[in-house]
């Protein structure tokens, strides 16, 4: 269950948990709370239009319950649930046996439902839709499927029925207000005849009845190191937030009640100034204006915060983040499959280095097995006609090319990675000449990615990702080749654990370099570059200086779990406004010219490289393993055509 989750500061109330038996007695915790509000100079606010609670929560204020400790309640044959509730919301974790059914019902409250495992056939007002969950594949030379968590928001009064798939399903339901029939089945006594609704409802930012994939929803940078997906409904608001390792959420308060579930990772909850380690499936209720904070551990953590009523400040933050993303990726733009190299011929394996030249897309087709063993004889360079999706090899069996860049005379500079050289090639596949194959009297190892400057020189990365156990150069490197052919190593060997993507700003004054792998037990080099994009000033002679962190790339949950810093950052491209697009395990991560996170383009498998194309240069072409995708943008891409 790797959803996403938590905020920092008074922005997304990241309340996380703590077992405090002495805090469950209202007078005691409130007295201490008032002292802490004064101590931290916090401003207490009260809400209007919030009904008096008619049902007492099963969770004490500030006290932790692990979801696994809750008793299971049978809702229907082969459908069992663990149920908990706050003042205005209810959550239930449903386990459905294979093909189990939840009969059609008229929903008595607004509801979100997320598919955590398996699949369901969901009837919404009689219309069927399939909803699924999929785990992330560990990326290698063959595999790379990205995760999927389908969800839907339905309003009170909607007709709903569910049938589990052949392997069953696990669902997360969130209701506001609480369901009286669920409470009856949970054995709660003396229930009221009805549950009051909020007088002042919020505007939903999701369409009722529309199925979404959680990983398609845009993340908001809530504070340094905290990114969240904010889903607002009329009666409640959800915040799926991820906090990076070591981040600290300072003490804060908010007038909305909050239920929070830890989904992944480790950390310490800080409630009423006391700390406690927390683990996945821990659940806590934070009453209105209770002082709380958190500290992320070595693997960071994800959590789901459920707010009642919805927080307007969160909604405004999410709105602003969406507007920034939509300024680049227009509303309605969808990732489109252009070519599937497992269904058409010639077969595509591990696609790389796409570049747009004279109305065609050119890219490398690298053969790898799952362990990244290469074979130049099974590799090729490909020309694709985007108007038809048809493609052909322009050269095959002669080199295992990687990055490419448009060069003089309408030709391409091509990184022949396994051939230890960079060549100039025509768009018909003819090698014109070897441009560089050595540095300091020794062969270069494996040129990976490349970018040309306005003077005809070029930069390339060499992460030594080659088959020879003994390398020629003394470490991973970044190089500059001037227009007259002089080769300069720009950084000390192994300054980057795995230098990969490289791109210049449109004005040519800044060079950006990313780092693919770092801090892994199985990788031979560690560096201090971690999961960052680094920016360097470009000097008049092509050398670089003033290296600095430009942006931080989000890490996937499997990398965080092993305490790695491998973003999978590969190819990068840039638009004329200076926005940077980075292919990573997480998707295409977009940053503005200041290095601020803008959003993510999600794909069915992790993107490897990308470029702008089409007549207006506003279409982003993205290669991913055996497939080629595209998506329209509002921005014009920058390429240094000579």
Show which residues each predicted segment covers.
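C-terminal motif of bacterial Sec signal peptides marking the signal peptidase cleavage site
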Residues: 20-22
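A short, N-terminal "cap"/entry segment at the start of jelly-roll beta-barrel domains
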Residues: 26-90, 130, 134, 138-143, ...
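Sequence-structural signature of mature extracellular/luminal beta-sheet repeat domains
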Residues: 65, 209-212, 316-642
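Conserved short histidine dyad/triad with adjacent acidic residue
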Residues: 75-77, 90-107, 222-224, 239-253
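Short beta-strand His + acidic residue motifs that chelate non-heme Fe in jelly-roll/DSBH
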Residues: 102-104, 122-123, 131, 145, ...
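Glycine- and acidic-residue-biased ligand/ion/polar-headgroup-sensing regions
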Residues: 108-127, 256-267, 272
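Short acidic-glycine-tyrosine-enriched beta hairpin
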Residues: 126-157, 274-288
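Ligand-binding loop in jelly-roll beta-barrel domains
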Residues: 145-150, 156-182, 288-313
